[in-house]
């Protein structure tokens, strides 16, 4: 049985497409029973603190999705607010609002999510942060 070096593994990974890397990460998570989120927090920290620290790191969310649950009574004001927040054109914003529940923004920080939620609720929309 031949031994594969770290350099050979890195060269192999470098040759993969983004989709293949995503599939590789998923397969590694399943095989080893780990989460890539815990690895991103820092492998040394996860090993030193044990499983409890990994659970805490997973619980503290840093990126949020802003979801328009419904547009309420004032659809026009909500469309204007969505246009201002997302930079979409009138038709795209209207289609997005009418397709509620719909994700308006993904992966935003907590402050931006709260600001967006506040402006949309002032326009009459129902908004969720996930």
From Swiss-Prot:
GO cellular component: cytosolic large ribosomal subunit
Ribosomal protein as UniProt keyword: yes
One MF term in the entry's GO annotations: mRNA binding
GO BP: translation
UniProt keyword annotations, A-Z: Ribonucleoprotein, Ribosomal protein
Complexes and interactors: Homodimer. Part of the ribosomal stalk of the 50S ribosomal subunit. Forms a multimeric L10(L12)X complex, where L10 forms an elongated spine to which 2 to 4 L12 dimers bind in a sequential fashion. Binds GTP-bound translation factors.
Protein family per UniProt: Belongs to the bacterial ribosomal protein bL12 family.
Entries under HAMAP family matching the protein: Ribosomal_bL12
Function: Forms part of the ribosomal stalk which helps the ribosome interact with GTP-bound translation factors. Is thus essential for accurate translation.
Protein name from the UniProt record: Large ribosomal subunit protein bL12
Source organism per UniProt: Yersinia pestis bv. Antiqua (strain Angola)
